[in-house]
């Protein structure tokens, strides 16, 4: 890879020597998967770090979404956002449910609670919001609506690792939250994911479902799948957990630099930190007003690429624009004006712990010039 290339993200890696030492222990034990000691330890350490009661590890970030819907026995219609990675909606479809899109709040990029009630029908059983870019949803407003109509709430928290509101982990909201530990995330286990739940009964059910439905050596209690995390990635995750706070702080410093440099650039806007929130700086999206900036989003995107700077248009196109979902009534662009506006103007700038001062300045100069 070109050494001068500035990538949009870069994986947080544990020391190779430290990881090799743990691998040797795993080799000696000959226990490489199926709820081994590293798996148990990582679940325990993550629950403490995230300030949640229970964590169940998965082999990637999509399977927790699929399994959460199964665990809560969701049927019918699920209200969700079109402004996310497509796995959010795929999980609904794979469970035989119908996704119903509602528009977003332009101040956050998250599902607009004011749009939810109008989308509820007698077939609605759940709401699946996303903490977009790690910015917390209005969890109280969403929960009030869910309680009023007897709906379950499953948060796709793929971007929200370690995010807190007034000192409380955001993953305590709703009935279940799911996480992605993909290599591109703030915290990664190479590939991986997790589910957060609030009681031991649900934890047991989910652990059964991710292990083919086995509740014992000879008893299957439901149609489960195999989505367990192995010992190697669990060990990797334990090591990465020790350095994730430093990585988040490094990201914070990048965000400070971007904001200071870009705040006065006409036609470029971005999100500021929310009061009382411990952010994780998963992404740094900017929004391009072509008329004011003098260049379209796609022109700036191409300019960055020509200079060896890889941004990403997260999330363009909207999920509702993919052929699989375009025919849904709720996918009508007239129903989703704010989501379309954001999708058509966004570029996520390079954001990771490994960016040098020179890298950051190159990104800034490309936008300011």
For the regions a language model picked out, list residue spans one by one:
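Conserved active-site segment immediately N-terminal to the catalytic lysine
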Residues: 155-189, 204, 216-221
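Histidine-centered beta-alpha loop that forms part of the nucleotide-sugar donor binding/catalytic region
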Residues: 83, 97, 104, 158-159, ...
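Short beta-strand-to-turn element immediately C-terminal to the catalytic PLP-Schiff-base lysine
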Residues: 180, 193-199, 238
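PLP-dependent aminotransferase-like
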Residues: 1, 70-157, 164
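Phosphate-binding glycine-rich loop
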Residues: 31, 35-77, 83, 91-94, ...
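Structural detector of well-ordered beta-strand residues that form the stable sheet scaffold
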Residues: 56, 79, 100, 153-154, ...
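PLP-dependent aminotransferase class I/II
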Residues: 37-45, 49-53, 114, 118, ...
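N-terminal "arm"/small-domain region of PLP-dependent enzymes with the aminotransferase-like
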Residues: 1-32, 350
């Amino acid at each position: 890879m070109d050494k001068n290339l500035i990538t949009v993200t870069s994986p947080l890696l544990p020391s190779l020597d430290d990881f090799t030492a743990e691998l040797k222990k795993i080799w000696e034990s000959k226990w490489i998967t199926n709820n081994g000691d590293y798996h148990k330890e990582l679940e325990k350490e993550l629950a403490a770090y995230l300030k949640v009661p229970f964590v169940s590890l998965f082999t990637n970030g999509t399977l927790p979404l699929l399994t959460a819907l199964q665990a809560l026995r969701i049927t019918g219609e699920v209200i969700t956002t079109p402004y996310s990675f497509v796995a959010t909606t795929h999980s609904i479809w794979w469970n035989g449910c119908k996704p119903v899109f509602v528009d977003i709040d332009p101040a956050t990029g998250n599902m607009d609670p004011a749009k939810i009630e109008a989308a509820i029908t007698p077939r609605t059983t759940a709401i699946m919001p996303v903490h977009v870019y790690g910015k917390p949803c209005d969890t109280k407003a969403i929960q009030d609506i869910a309680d009023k109509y007897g709906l379950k709430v499953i948060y796709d928290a793929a971007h929200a690792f370690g995010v807190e509101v007034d000192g409380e982990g955001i993953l305590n909201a709703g009935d279940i939250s799911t996480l992605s530990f993909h290599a591109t995330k703030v915290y990664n286990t190479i590939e991986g994911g997790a589910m957060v739940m609030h009681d031991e009964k649900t934890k047991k059910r989910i652990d059964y479902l991710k292990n083919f439905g086995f509740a014992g050596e000879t008893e299957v209690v439901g149609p489960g799948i195999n989505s367990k995390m192995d010992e190697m990635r669990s060990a990797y995750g334990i090591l990465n957990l020790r350095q994730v706070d430093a990585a988040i702080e490094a990201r914070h410093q990048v965000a400070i630099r971007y904001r200071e440099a870009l705040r006065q650039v006409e036609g470029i806007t971005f999100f500021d930190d929310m009061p009382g929130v411990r952010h994780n700086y998963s992404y740094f999206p900017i929004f391009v007003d072509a008329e004011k900036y003098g260049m379209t989003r796609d022109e700036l995107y191409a300019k960055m690429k020509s200079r060896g700077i890889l941004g990403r248009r997260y999330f363009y196109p909207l999920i509702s624009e993919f052929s699989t979902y375009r025919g849904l009534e709720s996918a009508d662009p007239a129903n989703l004006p704010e989501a379309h506006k954001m999708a058509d103007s966004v570029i996520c700038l390079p954001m990771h712990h490994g960016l040098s001062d020179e890298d950051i300045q190159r990104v800034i100069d490309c936008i300011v010039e």
